[in-house]
Amino acid sequence: MENLHNYKRFAVLYVDDEEKSLTNFSRAFGDQFHIFTAANAQEGLKLLEEHADEIGLLMTDQRMPGEKGVWLLERARKLRPNMIRVLVTAYADMDAAIAAVNSGAIYKYVTKPWDPPQLEQTLKRGLEYFMVRVSKSPSLNRGSSSTKR
């Protein structure tokens, strides 16, 4: 079985409209994980499409100008069903988090401001879960777009 602790094997995509949050995330986790960042949902979707086979975990803020985080998570689920999806919410956005959990669009939600040690564990467990799923069925790693080739 492949090493589940090779956390750089698959990338983490973090989407947030706050530049400071993107910078803090990259600084906190860049040594342990391969990181992509995007400043809005549309940019995040573009990165997902361009790097679909590289990204194992998507973490997105809910409240952003334009499309919301749940919108991106739903598209990610269609593009790459096995991708681990994490929603970042403020306490005021708990209804969105509950709806996302209930619809099956997310693996977990994280509240803002996030706690680095706790978030590190969430990212590690999420990537481990992704790697187990992929190792059991490599064809599941690819989303519906791969079947159109």
Language-model segments: what does each one mean?
Residues 71, 92-109:
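Alpha4 helix (beta4-alpha4-beta5 surface) of REC/receiver domains from two-component response regulators
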Residues 37-57:
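Acidic, metal-coordinating helix/loop segments flanking the phosphotransfer/catalytic sites
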Residues 95, 114-123, 127:
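C-terminal output helix
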Residues 1-13, 23-26, 54, 124, ...:
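Non-catalytic signal-transmission and effector/linker regions of two-component phosphorelay proteins
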Residues 59-61:
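Active-site T/S-Asp motif of two-component receiver
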Residues 46-49, 70-84, 99:
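Short amphipathic alpha-helix used as the core "switch/output" element in two-component signaling
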Residues 65, 89:
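The feature encodes the CheY-like receiver
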Residues 20-30, 47:
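Amphipathic alpha1 helix at the N-terminus of the CheY-like receiver
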